[in-house]
Amino acid sequence: MLIKMLTKVFGSRNDRTLRRMRKVVALINGMEPALEKLSDEELKAKTAEFRARLEKGETLENLLPEAFAVVREASKRVFGMRHFDVQLLGGMVLNDRCIAEMRTGEGKTLTATLPAYLNALTGKGVHVVTVNDYLAQRDAENNRPLFEFLGMSVAVNMSGMPAPAKREAYAADITYGTNNEYGFDYLRDNMAFSPEERVQRKLHYALVDEVDSILIDEARTPLIISGPAEDSSELYKKVNKIIPHLVRQEKEDSDTFQGEGHFSVDEKARQVNLTERGLVLVEELLVKEGIMDEGESLYSPGNIMLMHHVTAALRAHVLFTRDVDYIVKDGEVIIVDEHTGRTMQGRRWSDGLHQAVEAKEGVEIQNENQTLASITFQNYFRLYEKLAGMTGTADTEAFEFSSIYKLDTVVVPTNRPMIRKDLPDLVYMTEAEKIDAIIEDIKERTAKGQPVLVGTISIEKSEVISQALTKAGIEHNVLNAKFHAREADIVAQAGYPGAVTIATNMAGRGTDIMLGGSWQAEVAELEAPSEEQIAQIKADWQKRHDAVLASGGLHIIGTERHESRRIDNQLRGRSGRQGDPGSSRFYLSMEDALMRIFASDRVANMMRKLGMKPGEAIEHPWVTKAIANAQRKVESRNFDIRKQLLEYDDVANDQRRAIYTQRNELLDVADISETINSIREDVFKATIDAHIPPQSLEEMWDIPGLEERLKNDFDLELPIAQWLDKEPELHEETLRERILESAKEVYARKEEVVGAEMMRHFEKGVMLQTLDSLWKEHLAAMDYLRQGIHLRGYAQKDPKQEYKRESFAMFAAMLESLKYEVISTISKVQVRMPEEVEAMEQQRREEAERLAQMQQLSHQDDETAAAAALAEQTGERKVGRNDPCPCGSGKKYKQCHGRLS
């Protein structure tokens, strides 16, 4: 209460920010008459003038009013569109490293031209980030005439483009592309084998469209480039046969309770756990299938991977539903994005889950993948010097933007007042009653010519509604992941009088729904239309537009509440754009996922006690409030998950930055011989110390062991025992020096054969490949550590601190291994002629090119990389899965260190 009173007196932070910015808007408006008098050439010359002023030390903030005024004037001349004052406010918010919340239809695409132009003046590049390739291309083509009029180059960074074209796109002043593509290019650049292979410049300014979708909904999805791991498809098929034998454990107070089941399900956490009874049955079935020996336990160390397969299969059957979480198309399991309802072609679940779903659906099981490089969007976008974003719905997530990305949210006012009517929710007892009520509402609305947009949360639900509409004889369009190609056409015509459109979640985001339909789409269908035809189409459209306005505008029906209020607001935001009339209502039932999981049984019991008849609905502010509270609970839980993920990923991020910085330094330097010499000294010192401890007596020296180690690991045959017999005065220090000198001599002879330049190339190649190989293994080990670290909590230890401590120890060990393997590899390589080194180099280059091509072709989360060939080239010894582990534990390789590779 007190806060509300103070806000009334002093204004909110948002009001104060906008008040300050309105003064600048007045300045910009004051410049308009003078700029109108300039010729096109004089207006174009302003860009060069601004750049010259920047070089002399003026700041972007000083240039902002004049630069914005120039863009507005250019837009009037090129598009015949003048930026509204609220769009100038939005542009200033975006330049201030903030998030601008601008309602649907307020012209976010045109607003983005202002800060994009201003920040591109620095010459460091501006990245405009969109959610899909279609929007990136559309926005780039729409804005290209304006930017090119002002002397700015514009390019699109598309998936599947060859490296030279990508390099050109990044060299442009303003680059449009998707979040995935920017992230993958960053990872690919950090896997490059020469500076010429890199495509990105230093990350300067990112302007993120639909920022909530990219920085919040996608934040839990890491971008992963991976290579194939070993084939275990048969095991997935065998384990898949076991799952149908298991019975789900119901709650004791539920109607279906029949005693202890084989597994329990936690829908909130999306987890499944075997019960004692389930464990016994699974072990029996595994023995029967011949996968496990009798008397063995599923929890024994040797069966950890088997346990992992069982859990993955169980999750695939219980938690993942066809046409909700994924679709099966052309014998392939394709993930459906839970937030947008779009299919994510090429993306695969990790940890064997995707293979388990493939086994469940009986399609071909593709090999598991092994991570070669990964980064989360949270960490990628924090690499930019300057970050800003815009969306129609950010205010509900303002706290998360502020705490994770240090971005403040500013709500930009609408150009015209909002007059949409948001009607209270209606809650029914069953799903069937709810669908009947929705059909009745649609009949009433379409009878008076009002267009209706029905929002569903999954493909399955959209098909249920579609069947009900077909049964009722109502014509309609369905917009979901299965009908991806027609998306923009369907959305464009969804405002036609009496049109009914069913859309999964926010499919079609970024395309406006025009009341009366889109006359532009009709014109585009005609071949070379005449002026009269265009005038006639516009006149017909105006009649339809007026008819829709008279009927009440676009009506939105939500078929259930989403986990996030923001996505509900996005659905509502499709109606009432730019001051148009409109209405919205959500229909819910007690069988909806959100109500079942989070709204307590009290509501259902209360509805029963009230003696509600079938078909009756509850409509009360209390119910709406209870649902909003349930959504808040889910939002805060999801925020905690993302925050937790970020805290763990920050540890990996520090290591990633260190490795990538080191790698880029290696790439940029032509000669790394000094580094190699320094590493050689460290490695030989450690090797000799292991057999000749410092300041020790001669009796403690292990000379045969040292000779054998030098021969096996460094291909160095030295008669150390003979030296000691012949020269009794040789002491520890002089012996060390002699061994090191001998190693250098052998290496120098190799260099003489092939030439210094060729040897430098070879050293660099070995260093980069070994670094990549060990980094890949380190990522896998970090994944395993991350999965089990929460168990440390039972020992009264802080899992996060334990993770930091152990991962640092693993990182230090990895760097030691790097030194050892590099020296071992370059010492063992037998070089006789320069042609041989050239052949090795050529082989490595071809491998790198093939890898890059595969990544470009697949343009997916799970990009393919040939890791096996790298191992052969660097001379690593291949260990069979059933061979004894080289670490000396006595276990088979597959049950020891083989699990990490």
Curated annotation (Swiss-Prot):
Q: Does the keyword Protein transport apply?
A: yes
Q: Where are the transmembrane segments?
A: none
Q: Quaternary form?
A: Monomer and homodimer. Part of the essential Sec protein translocation apparatus which comprises SecA, SecYEG and auxiliary proteins SecDF-YajC and YidC.
Name of the protein: Protein translocase subunit SecA
Q: Which Gene3D superfamilies match?
A: Helical scaffold and wing domains of SecA, P-loop containing nucleotide triphosphate hydrolases, SecA, preprotein cross-linking domain
How does the record classify its membrane topology?
Answer: Peripheral membrane protein
Question: Which SUPFAM superfamilies does its entry note?
Answer: Helical scaffold and wing domains of SecA, P-loop containing nucleoside triphosphate hydrolases, Pre-protein crosslinking domain of SecA
Q: Name one GO biological process term.
A: protein import
Entry GO terms, CC: cell envelope Sec protein transport complex; cytosol; plasma membrane
Domain of life of the source: Bacteria
Entry function: Part of the Sec protein translocase complex. Interacts with the SecYEG preprotein conducting channel. Has a central role in coupling the hydrolysis of ATP to the transfer of proteins into and across the cell membrane, serving both as a receptor for the preprotein-SecB complex and as an ATP-driven molecular motor driving the stepwise translocation of polypeptide chains across the membrane.
Name the UniProt key words of this record, in alphabetical order. Answer: ATP-binding, Cell inner membrane, Cell membrane, Cytoplasm, Membrane, Metal-binding, Nucleotide-binding, Protein transport, Translocase, Translocation, Transport, Zinc
| Record's note on what induces expression | Repressed under conditions of excess protein secretion capacity and derepressed when protein secretion becomes limiting. This is regulated by SecM.
Q: Which InterPro entries match?
A: Helicase_ATP-bd, Helicase_C-like, P-loop_NTPase, SEC_C_motif, SecA, SecA_CS, SecA_DEAD, SecA_motor_DEAD
* Family designation: Belongs to the SecA family.
List the cofactors.
Answer: Zn(2+)
For the ligand (Zn(2+)), the binding residues are C885, C887, C896, H897
The reactions it catalyses are: ATP + H2O + cellular proteinSide 1 = ADP + phosphate + cellular proteinSide 2
List localization entries.
Cell inner membrane; Cytoplasm
Residue runs in coiled coils: none
Query: Quick one: where's region Disordered?
Result: 855-891
The residues listed in the UniProt record as binding ATP, with positions renumbered to this chain, are Q87, G105, E106, G107, K108, T109, D512
Q: Write down the PANTHER family for this protein, in alphabetical order.
A: CHLOROPLAST PROTEIN-TRANSPORTING ATPASE (PTHR30612:SF0), SECA INNER MEMBRANE COMPONENT OF SEC PROTEIN SECRETION SYSTEM (PTHR30612)
Protein biosynthesis in keyword set: no
Q: Name one Pfam family in it.
A: SEC-C
